[in-house]
Amino acid sequence: MPDGRRVRAGELVAVYRDNGAIDGQFRYLSSYLDDPEAFPLDPVNLPLVPGPQDVGRPQAGVHGVFEDALPDDWGRRMLCRQYGLSDHQARPPHLLSLMRGGGMGALLFAREHCPVQETVERPPMVLQDVARAALDFEKGELKDNDPLLPYLYGVGTSPGGARPKFLFAMDDGKHFLVKLPSLRDTVSPVPIEAACLATAADCGFSVARSRLLDEGLA
């Protein structure tokens, strides 16, 4: 909420049809509607009204604002590997339930009566080792018994995005979103993004602090 409180906003329901379509609905909880700080999660498609609101997106089964809270290609493949999901199982309603209150942003998701995962303190890691493991995962070469795989599950699914990335605590204790080159790149976008951020800062825009690191991963 705007005042920092964490509250339950509503409930998602998904019914899977034999033809592969998903009938989805969302409804705000009355406690949320009665909250003076309540705001619509999607002003256009999810106004603050009581009762179920149909999704109308049979392939996704959830409103767009909720699907946007999921990771894209990179993070979804991480979730599928972590939970052994088939393509049929890797649909937005099921993926959202696996987040268990994790992820980034203002919206958190968990299955009803399922405990929300607790934030755990992760041991310090060497950036180059984690980056190498992330690239091995993209190549399909990261083995199930690799000691860095559980670490990647913890730091690589929540940031989302279609490209390899993970959260990492630097030596100074600052957390950075580490973005890596992809095997599918014909030109590495990493230095280009860094240059764009630097240019925006020079023009007076407020941008995130960034570093361009060469970890010898080419």
Task: Give each language-model segment a name.
Residues 1-218:
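Phosphate/dinucleotide-binding and metal-coordinating scaffold of catalytic cores
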